[in-house]
Amino acid sequence: MTITKTVTNFGTVSIVGVGLIGASLGLALKQADVVNQVLGVGRSKENLDQALKMGAIDGVVDLVEAAKHSDVIVLCVPVAQMRAAFETIEPYLEPKTMLTDAGSTKGDVILAAKEVLGKKACQFVPAHPIAGGAQHGAIAAKANLFEGKQTIICPLQENSPADTALIEDFWQSVGAVVKKISSVQHDAIYAAVSHLPHILSYALMASVINSEDAEQKLDHVGAGFKDFTRIAASSPEMWRDICLGNRTSILKELDQYLAIVQHMRKLIADNDGTGLEKLFKKASQARQDLDVI
């Protein structure tokens, strides 16, 4: 196919990894009419074919072609694959091409970008759209996935104000509410409010299916169990990489959580209804308050 470099709106956007996030981004960009073309890069023929079929991308290219001909490149691959993507992109990255990503961890991705891209790291503005779902793959994509949802941007010192503003505009164009924080803040916060909940959901599911009477238990699950374990249906590969990529912050949150669980276990063992109710009331009120934020 013929690729033409443009400057209209965001021009040619290449999305590397057209799963749920990548394909949804393609749909959203095209619906917003802020691009000339969206190109897909990926290893999954199934996702690429599905993205083409649904109109999320206009064509398929390899990463080298994307680096040579794109105005914006968005990395939507698992965080452990970011370094390899940077390594492929770096020799062909044009000075006017901007990079952003959708990774759920930032410290490790930024380190890889700086080590691989060197002086070109100024062209990378890290981002994390707080959107997704238990389903994964292009088949689950939807154009309104980012509408009204936060996208966190963690600018580098090397980024120019103009480049940061461009990537802010890029994510806002698909309906995202952009917030800027440091990568250190990002990884500490999301270890608690995103990464830990996924780990706990996987852990509960694993606990039940590994028990001797697993079949009987699963035959009796209700809405509460299904709600709690919904996110355990998320991509195992992605969450493996997130856990390892943000392990320092995650281990800190896990230790704090386990201390609470041990405290609750002691209250139950001691038949301490007053202590349990006090703990539950505090947590319950905090959860109710969350709904009015």
Per-region residue spans from a language model:
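Glycine-rich, N-terminal phosphate-binding loop of Rossmann-like dinucleotide-binding domains
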Residues: 77-78, 103, 155
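Internal alpha-helical scaffold of NAD(P)-dependent oxidoreductase catalytic cores
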Residues: 143-230
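Residues at the starts of beta-strands that form the adenosine-phosphate
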Residues: 12, 37, 123, 150, ...
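Rossmann-like NAD(P)-binding element
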Residues: 63-98
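NAD(P)+-binding Rossmann beta1-loop-alpha1 motif at the extreme N-terminus of oxidoreductases
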Residues: 2-67
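Rossmann-like NAD(P)(H) cofactor-binding subdomain of soluble oxidoreductases
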Residues: 88-139
